[in-house]
Amino acid sequence: MAAKDVVFGDSARAKMVEGVNILANAVKVTLGPKGRNVVLERSFGGPTVTKDGVSVAKEIELKDKLQNMGAQMVKEVASKTSDNAGDGTTTATVLAQSIVREGMKYVASGMNPMDLKRGIDKAVAAAVEELKKISKPCTTNKEIAQVGSISANSDSSIGDRIAEAMDKVGKEGVITVEDGKSLADELDVVEGMQFDRGYLSPYFINNPDKQVAVLENPFVLLHDKKVSNIRDLLPVLEQVAKAGRPLLIIAEDVEGEALATLVVNNIRGILKTVAVKAPGFGDRRKAMLEDIAILTGGQVIAEETGLTLEKATLAELGQAKRIEVGKENTTIIDGAGEAVNIEARVKQIRTQIEEATSDYDREKLQERVAKLAGGVAVIKVGAATEVEMKEKKARVEDALHATRAAVEEGIVPGGGVALIRARTAIAALTGVNADQNAGIKIVLRAMEEPLRQIVTNGGEEASVVVAAVAAGKGNYGYNAATGEYVDMVEAGVVDPTKVTRTALQNAASVAGLLLTTDAAVAELPKEDAPMPGGMPGGMGGMGMDM
């Protein structure tokens, strides 16, 4: 085991604060509408230019072990805020730096760090309650567009695209972000349920121009096992042929003579069918088949439910208005399922989302809700160069997270104003002793910091603006984009409540840990072994003169 360097007290804290400052100073220049760019080196290809706080934070690793510890703790603030709320990473970093900087002064003067932390926690809890009171619901398209624009660094076109997408697929719908093929941003909306499985044979295609199989008013047969024997399918195929309607078969797989017979029938025009594999794997496949059954008003033909293929009737098949099957996707439009059953299924999946422990499971469940309840929208990001594309795509993803957060918990006035207003709840607080009161003061001072930084990045005098905004009431604040004092909500400068709340809570949490640190243990740098001595020189002449 390598030897460790153990550093105590002020020496440890001072080094860690240096690390905090290095990271925070690099991140905070990106804050606000007039935030600056940060250029990140790449091991290959061109550098990345970004105004996204968390992207900058993730790049930073410091050579000094103790400094790096401090930097990594603040990096945790940024990434945690990004994961929870999707935005507010720079605000969280600025708040954490301020709490640490002010707190260290009190710790150095001999105050009890634990009481300081209790004071900080008390102040943050009061501020969060006040933020909830200030918050107002975000419901209109205009408000959603405003939140999206602010999070995308004041790019209104991105905000408009997100609002349009949410309008099309509903608040529960899935919105994904992809690289576009042109210079302009585009929005594609898939109505109905789409899953990522296509036709099993190109002979099913009946629309050669689009290379898809289109079924109008079809039956849908759902089976959880492989189908290889055509005899199993014959009874149900005969019933469908009599009804004179097409059939979509979704099974674990369709192979051998079963697939060959379906293809031959399709080519001869006897029965229009398409076979596709069931989406997902394992338990998720069963759940998705059940979703499709509820959406189309059919049943999954499975041994568990006591149903077999040979005895299947038209009553057990699902129905839809139209189904399109491409090479890689199948879209079911206007399934014949009962609205009550679909709603019950959505409710059931939502309960599973709340209980889900992994992000992956939660994401997959959310997709299932969207496919049942709304639809899927794809925002295709357009840009001139790859560097711009990456930067813009990151901003669109940020804005998307922020708008979801706004719809979830509402909005507060942006530009650092909400934190200034929330200070009123803290000003009246008193702690048990002087040290706790100092902790409350630390948070009071820190809550000015985001506004100060926004103004500083805009090239104005911060103290004057902070005093003017603090003297105002309600949504009155400073719009750094125009340099005017306005009603922030009317001007469209709003932040999701969840973003502001999460930023403050995460910043206080990590800053509190740093303040109560009294020792740091780091690996000693490895001493390079000296190079071995060189080989002796070559042999001289042998001196064999004849």
UniProtKB/Swiss-Prot annotation:
GO molecular function annotation: ATP binding; ATP-dependent protein folding chaperone; isomerase activity; unfolded protein binding
The UniProt record lists the keyword ATP-binding: yes
InterPro entries in the record: Chaperonin_Cpn60_CS (IPR018370), Cpn60/GroEL (IPR001844), Cpn60/GroEL/TCP-1 (IPR002423), GroEL-like_apical_dom_sf (IPR027409), GROEL-like_equatorial_sf (IPR027413), TCP-1-like_intermed_sf (IPR027410)
Biased composition (Gly residues): 534-546
Binding annotation for ATP: 30-33, 51, 87-91, 415, 479-481, 495
Cellular component GO terms, alphabetical: cytoplasm
Designated name of the protein: Chaperonin GroEL
Source organism phylogeny: Bacteria, Pseudomonadati, Pseudomonadota, Betaproteobacteria, Burkholderiales
